[in-house]
């Protein structure tokens, strides 16, 4: 049985949270950029061009690709032959999310109790999806889930 300290999980999750908000997956920028030539609509080409410009600007300035860094969603494949020492897995993940979002100066937008609407100021708790898999390793992936616009006004339908 392999032992993995919870501090290693915390450190890894912190790095993943920052990276997920600052860098696109490999090849994604090129995919969007390549779509510009194939797109028929001038408006769509313009929007895709703006997205590529935003990606480049964010990389140059070292800031998040989107201002809505959202809720941290963590996917974990935990080997059945792993023993986590120290803190509980969920606590280690949430500590990593807090470190990543606070140290990375990412937008803190999670509320503890939705009815009170009080911000936790560290973007926890995260949504954590776990799978127990064969082996003695832990594989972690972070995916920020943006929230979109919070001040929504729905107009009444037009009557004919």
Name what the model sees in each region:
Residues 1-48:
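Acidic/polar, glycine-rich intrinsically disordered N-terminal extensions of enzymes
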Residues 24-32, 43-48, 62, 102-116:
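Flexible, glycine/charged-enriched surface loops at secondary-structure junctions
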Residues 39-63, 120:
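Translation machinery proteins
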Residues 64-67, 75, 131, 141-145:
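Short beta-strand segments
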Residues 70-134:
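A generic, well-ordered mixed alpha/beta core segment in the N-terminal half of proteins
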Residues 148-150:
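ATP-dependent carboxylate/acyl-activation modules
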């Amino acid at each position: 049985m392999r032992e993995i300290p919870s501090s290693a999980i915390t450190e890894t999750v912190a790095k993943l949270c920052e990276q997920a908000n600052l860098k696109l997956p490999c090849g994604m920028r090129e995919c969007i950029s390549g779509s510009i030539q194939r797109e028929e609509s001038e408006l769509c080409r313009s929007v895709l061009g703006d997205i590529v410009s935003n990606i480049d600007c964010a990389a140059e300035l070292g800031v998040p690709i989107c201002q809505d860094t959202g809720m941290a969603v963590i996917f974990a494949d935990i080997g059945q032959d792993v023993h986590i020492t120290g803190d509980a897995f969920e606590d280690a993940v949430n500590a990593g999310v807090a470190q990543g979002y606070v140290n990375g100066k990412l937008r803190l937008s999670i509320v503890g109790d939705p009815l009170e609407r009080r911000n936790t100021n560290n973007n926890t708790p995260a949504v954590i999806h776990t799978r127990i898999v064969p082996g003695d390793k832990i594989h972690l992936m972070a995916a920020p889930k943006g929230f979109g616009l919070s001040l929504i006004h729905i107009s009444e339908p037009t009557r004919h």
